Amino acid sequence: MAHRGEAGQAPENTRLALTRCIEDYLEWEEVDVRLTKDGKHVLAHDAVLRSGTNAELTIAEHTLEELKQVDLGSNFAARFAGERMLSLAECFALAKGNLNLYLDCKAVNPEQLAREIIDAGMEKQVVVYDQLERLRRCHEVAPGKVALMAKWRPDVGPPSWAPSNHLVAVEIDADSITPEICRAFHALGIKVETKNLGDWDRPAYWDKSVAAGADWIQTDLPEEVMAHALWQRIKLRPVRFSLHRGANRYAPENTLPAFEKAIRLGADFVEFDVRTTSDGKFYLLHDSRLDGKTDGHGLISETPSSIIAGLSAGVKFGRSYAKVGLPTLDEFLNAVAGKVDLYFDAKAIAPEALTAALKRHGVVERTVVYGSPGFLAKIKAQDPRIRLLPPLGSPDELEVLARDLKPYAVDTDWNILSRELIARCHALNIKVFSDALGKHERVEDYLQAMDWGIDLIQTDHPLRLMRAIELSTTRKDPTSAGAE
């Protein structure tokens, strides 16, 4: 259950935060609900709204129309400028059929809220969390039709307290959950959600909640919870995966936070791009220009490292990453060596420098290098242990690549993938990698490629690929994935 949406990647409680949950195939999101001066329910955690110009508006003292004028995005990042407050009606329209909602009622009209849920046809997708007095008012308007949930602690009474107050679920702090508590509530037909925020939002407490039998985990790290749980259930993966420029969906691409996130998500490989500055230093950057992903300007090849070192590589992603810079190749290798395999996209670096860096950090045998056949031939001459990954744009190119380069794998255009081509590659002792970037980032596409025998999928959407991995594993052995 994502707390205020994917609030680490988009402004909390906004359309963008909800949309990201839907795109990641998350099942539940927690949102906060308040009432405006003109009686409209809106999504907001704090009672006071702060705009990109630092203006402050008390939600209960302003109309929805007035609040809709406030820019909620600029404080997060300039790319979100113009993001507006979401009404509950708009939230329901977006979530219907796509995302279940935990409504954390900060200041609502209970009777009106119950009617709005029913009128929107959201009874089966919503649970309302509030104090008991307001929950009773919801129940009086729609007895048995709207799911109700409240906080439970041992001092409020035995588990029978929940059904006696018309609740269908309870929230319990993650440090208090036990198997005995869960079993007692489940015996009464009551679901259990654990609040795993703050210091409790880490693997030890996630495991504690799962082991206790919790039905939901509320978290600010839904992507990590999902990955952590999946890899405990699935030990033998049907395919390996690489995260493109690191976990670029959750942190700025080609930065240390993106690669650290990728490792926590269980990536087999991280892909990264290397370019050279005007004074011969090596930095991670995809584009030839600095303008796209940093606050710098111009070509990196015409910029000295003294300038590069002072740039922000994160401010355009989100202001919380404003102090994150472009890592040097050595900084990157120091951070990840031995933790994950490396997919080295040699954008602009001499073969000799590339080989020397891999040797210096002891990662020669954990690296594949992507580049043109001519460039890779030079790498092979430097050190034949380095695994080579040339592009394969046409099946007709395969035999020549196999004969002249003897690559470890080929980076195959997704559009030419087939069972027959993959079998041909395997017969030549060549693995098949492919980028599912863009239009092929779909569960059905991943599943087809896995069925054909692909060895590695590169993705920008790890949770989508994980969904496909779980489906593939379950179809082959319904008992192998286990129960959540």
Walk through the language-model features, giving the residues of each.
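Phosphate-group recognition and catalysis centered on beta-loop-alpha active-site segments
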Residues: 1-484
